[in-house]
Amino acid sequence: MSVGIFDSGLGGLTVLDAVQTRLPDMPFAYLADSAHAPYGVRTADDIYDLTCQSVARLFDAGCNLVILACNTASAAALRRMQESWVPEDKRVLGVFVPLIEAMTERQWGDNSPPREVGVKHVALFATPATVASRAFQRELAFRAIGVDVEAQACGGVVDAIEDGDMMLAEALVRSHVEALQRKMPTPDAAILGCTHYPLMQDIFQKALGENVRVFSQANLVADSLADYLERHPGMRGTGSPVFLTTGDPARVSDRATQFLRRRIEFSAA
């Protein structure tokens, strides 16, 4: 019984790497739905159906707790899953909760009225589906007032990263940052709202400038998971790490090894 980590592709490996560093003795089962990636251009219903299929596969593998290490799935499917699909003895958590907590400097269960926070102008870089869901804006509005969020749908970046074309990914990042800056010239902070994007964090930071605080999720999610498992020790897993993909295992293994710079072997899901 491992803790499951799900992503539409390989971006969730940034979260896996951080949680393995934070929780080195914890076994994880990682599932990449590479056959259907990217999710960011799909409809909300399609994302929901695909996410449920993959999470069910992790439940079948013995996971009682699954992390959606995919902002698109977290934004478009998580709430619906939690309300009507997840079994009572299982838990599914998303990745943007820790980010909202960090930005608003308050805990998720804090239901006090919205208040002013330190940042006023926030740039959001995410997939088209995440931007369309307005999930970040909605959750920020519940907790903070006076925050202007300008969203930039970053088409093509995930495809380039999944294909290993980092030169194209870098060019696309710079283009999307320039497009955002035409709408919001001087953001206080930037959200990398896709778990693929930390692989390009240095490029985002250079393009935005050193005065912009860039929020990247991996370490925030790792700390949040460690806290959650302390409060819910029954969800801690046992067993051996496993890597599963709906795509070609050899190809996905090579890409994952390139990303993490250590050998990762995927099997067919």
Swiss-Prot record:
Pfam families to which the protein is assigned, alphabetical: Asp_Glu_race
Pathway connected to this protein: Cell wall biogenesis; peptidoglycan biosynthesis
Residues that bind substrate: 7-8, 39-40, 71-72, 195-196
Family matches, as InterPro entries: Asp/Glu/hydantoin_racemase (IPR015942), Asp/Glu_race (IPR001920), Asp/Glu_racemase_AS_1 (IPR018187), Glu_race (IPR004391)
Catalytic activity: L-glutamate = D-glutamate
Alphabetical GO biological process terms: cell wall organization; peptidoglycan biosynthetic process; regulation of cell shape
GO molecular function: glutamate racemase activity
Active site, UniProt feature: 70, 194
EC number per UniProt: 5.1.1.3
Entry keywords, A to Z: Cell shape, Cell wall biogenesis/degradation, Isomerase, Peptidoglycan synthesis
Cited PANTHER family: GLUTAMATE RACEMASE
Protein task: Provides the (R)-glutamate required for cell wall biosynthesis.
Annotated family: Belongs to the aspartate/glutamate racemases family.
HAMAP family named in the record: Glu_racemase
Protein's name in the database: Glutamate racemase
Species of the source: Roseobacter denitrificans (strain ATCC 33942 / OCh 114) (Erythrobacter sp. (strain OCh 114))
